[in-house]
């Protein structure tokens, strides 16, 4: 299944458009070159953090996410779910936990995938297939979230983990809603 998602090429993206399994709207986006590091810089109203995309293990998910970043899809969104000591979740343009880009891609994570502090992965509903990814993502703030390997791994925080931890303290553990608005002012991709 993932063999069709690969591609050669040079630079930040291959010239080949995606052949990734998708559901929903028909979309195409360039595939990222797995030999080049790709970082997402996230500027929030509480500070900045960055994460490196795991193109090797999640070629379709990372390429789709990078395409959304380039389109400024995430700019102005909020972290709509904050569970102290567990995760922060964002990427929903409706801020309801039900929004997305109108399509999903699939990158089934390895059976040994771990969701430890700083790991960035894609959120999905319990009815969606393993590895389904739209636009909603979460960042683990616990030493180990204890989740099964069902969530496509997007990458890992490489800078600003203290900012992520600070955001992670601004949630209500019962309602899982933020106690303070945390907005993504801008996301940018560097390669």
Q: Where are the language model's segments positioned?
A:
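Cyclophilin-like peptidyl-prolyl cis-trans isomerases
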Residues: 2-191
């Amino acid at each position: 299944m993932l063999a069709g998602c690969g591609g050669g090429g040079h630079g930040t993206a291959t010239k080949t458009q995606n052949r990734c399994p998708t559901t929903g709207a028909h979309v195409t986006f360039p595939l990222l070159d797995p030999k080049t590091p790709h970082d997402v810089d996230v500027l929030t109203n509480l500070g900045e953090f960055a994460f490196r995309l795991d193109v090797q293990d999640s070629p379709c998910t990372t390429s789709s996410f990078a395409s959304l970043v380039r389109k400024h899809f995430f700019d102005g969104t909020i972290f709509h779910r904050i569970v102290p000591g567990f995760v922060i979740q964002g990427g929903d343009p409706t801020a309801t936990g039900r929004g997305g880009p109108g399509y999903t891609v699939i990158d089934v994570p390895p059976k040994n995938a771990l969701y430890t502090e700083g790991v960035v992965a894609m959120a999905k509903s319990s009815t969606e297939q393993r590895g389904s990814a739209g636009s909603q993502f979460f960042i683990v703030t616990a030493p180990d979230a204890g989740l099964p390997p069902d969530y496509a791994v997007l990458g890992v925080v490489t800078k600003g983990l203290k900012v992520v931890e600070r955001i992670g303290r601004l949630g209500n553990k019962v309602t899982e809603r933020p106690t303070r608005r945390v907005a993504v002012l801008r996301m940018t991709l560097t390669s």
